Amino acid sequence: MAKKITKKQARKETAAAVENALEKYLSTTLSADEGKQAGDTSPLGTPYRRGSVTLRGKMVPRHSTTGKLISEEPGTDWRDADPWRTLRIQSEFVDGFDALAKLGPAVSIFGSARTEPTDPYYEHAMQIAGKLANKNIAVITGGGPGIMEAANRGAALAGGTSVGLSIELPFEETTNDWVNLGIEFRYFFVRKTMFVKYSSGAIFFPGGYGTLDEMFEVLVLAQTHKIGNMPIVLFGTEYWQDLVKWIKGPLLDQNMISESDIDLFTVTDSHEEAIRIATSGITSK
């Protein structure tokens, strides 16, 4: 039987994991600085994003925003106090609303940051995004590499609006080069608000914890009617089939969800079907 841990222990373990990831990022950045010769592009290493601020080299902080947010230890820096943090959160909402207010119809594309350009799903994401752009529909992603880069690339090459909603993480790269409208966030919940507020549909490609987190949050918002008509597409039947089997099996059999909840998403391998369903929330308005 698994040993139960307290909330305090869980917070400490999470904070430690964040700090370990940050240390790994810093060691990689600093080691990349060594051996740089005159004339190299830059000796400062990979940029670190903190909201709208870009930091490199020695200016990269040793503690992350997330680590401070979940810490129970009282902070000595007034910038870490809850009232100041509240203002910072408000400013992120204002920046996001201001940047996206006139975006127009849009579809969000989610997926793994680890997908390589040689992966077939990368090409699928590129093509679907390009086809959306050709319909004058903006494409919104998390702004990172992998599937996100592929979708931004497809939209940009088609001459469309390619949006990247990036997040401050100590172990991920900066916004990909195919974003033509980018916003940097510190807080996941602000970023997620922008996804659901400005998208009329969502397409989920294969991904890990981050993609699953985003997918289930959108499903819950649709299930509880917190958002309106939000068509949800899972692209890649081979990848999603076991998850769908679990949802239609134990979840439904044990009355954890309703029959109607199964209809909240569609699984497909077809570009045309994915686009038709994802944009049905736009065409029905």
Feature annotation, model-predicted:
Residues T174-D177, L212, A222-M230, T237-K245, ...:
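Glycine-rich phosphate/nucleotide-binding loop
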